[in-house]
């Protein structure tokens, strides 16, 4: 057991020596390095590497999170905003979302009009007399069709809003 451990140590020291010879070739000059010399040169190299990298990657703090989030949101917004000559596959992001928080409770005015790219849950809206709008088939998974009267409209939560995007339909949005 002890022989295997010593063999592993010697193999690792030999690898370190060959790496250090490449880096410190002007200082070593073909002399035989002892184990202590190899370890000292390794420590010296690691310290110089640590000092050279210290200013490159500062430790992130929680203060930078909001500005980083808003910067990322601006970049995503620019990528998703339709431009000239686009095929129309992109959709616009809210300018209000770029300004504020990710929670609607922070700024209730920022949720005036939403145009998300995600699919919506469609449900029939009620007309003035309490009757349903005209029936239209809804596509279901597996290619099944079902009448829209069988779909129950979800009840919006207190901070959710329903948008009217097509006549006779309400769209439930979780924000």
UniProtKB/Swiss-Prot annotation:
Q: Which SMART domains does the record match to this protein?
A: HLH (SM00353)
| Annotated GO MF terms | DNA-binding transcription repressor activity, RNA polymerase II-specific; protein dimerization activity; RNA polymerase II cis-regulatory region sequence-specific DNA binding
Q: Where is this motif: WRPW motif?
A: 172-175
Q: Where is the composition biased (Low complexity)?
A: 129-148
Query: Boundaries of each bHLH domain copy?
Result: 1-49
PROSITE patterns from the entry?
Answer: BHLH, ORANGE
Note whether tRNA processing occurs among the keywords. no
| Keywords assigned by UniProt, alphabetized | DNA-binding, Nucleus, Repressor, Transcription, Transcription regulation
List each copy of the Orange domain by range. Answer: 65-98
Q: Which GO terms describe its biological process?
A: hindbrain morphogenesis; in utero embryonic development; midbrain development; midbrain-hindbrain boundary morphogenesis; negative regulation of transcription by RNA polymerase II; neural tube development; oculomotor nerve development; positive regulation of transcription by RNA polymerase II
Under Pfam families, the record lists: HLH
Q: Where is this region: Disordered?
A: 126-166
Q: Where in the cell is it found?
A: Nucleus
Assigned GO CC terms: nucleus
Which InterPro entries does UniProt cross-reference here?
Answer: bHLH_dom, HES_HEY, HLH_DNA-bd_sf, Orange_dom
Q: Which PANTHER family does the record associate with it?
A: BASIC HELIX-LOOP-HELIX TRANSCRIPTION FACTOR, HES-RELATED
| Known partners and oligomeric status | Transcription repression requires formation of a complex with a corepressor protein of the Groucho/TLE family.
As for what it does, the entry says:
Transcriptional repressor of genes that require a bHLH protein for their transcription.
* Record text about domains: Has a particular type of basic domain (presence of a helix-interrupting proline) that binds to the N-box (CACNAG), rather than the canonical E-box (CANNTG). The C-terminal WRPW motif is a transcriptional repression domain necessary for the interaction with Groucho/TLE family members, transcriptional corepressors recruited to specific target DNA by Hairy-related proteins.
Provide the protein name.
Transcription factor HES-3
Ranked from the top, the taxonomy reads:
Eukaryota, Metazoa, Chordata, Craniata, Vertebrata
């Amino acid at each position: 057991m002890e022989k295997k451990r010593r063999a592993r140590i010697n193999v690792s020291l030999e690898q370190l020596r060959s790496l250090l010879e490449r880096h410190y070739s002007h200082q070593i000059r073909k002399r035989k390095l002892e184990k202590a010399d190899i370890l000292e040169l390794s420590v010296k190299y690691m310290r110089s590497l640590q000092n050279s990298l210290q200013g490159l990657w500062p430790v992130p703090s929680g203060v930078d999170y909001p500005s980083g989030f808003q910067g990322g949101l601006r970049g995503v917004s620019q990528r998703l905003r339709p431009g000239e000559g686009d095929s129309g596959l992109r959709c616009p992001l809210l300018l209000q979302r770029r300004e504020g928080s990710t929670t609607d409770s922070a700024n209730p005015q920022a949720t005036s009009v939403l145009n998300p790219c995600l699919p919506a849950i469609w449900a029939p809206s009620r007309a003035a007399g309490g009757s349903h709008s005209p029936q239209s088939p809804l596509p279901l998974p597996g290619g099944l069709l079902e009448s829209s009267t069988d779909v129950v409209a979800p009840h919006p939560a207190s901070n959710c809003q329903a948008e009217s995007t097509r006549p006779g339909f309400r769209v439930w949005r979780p924000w």
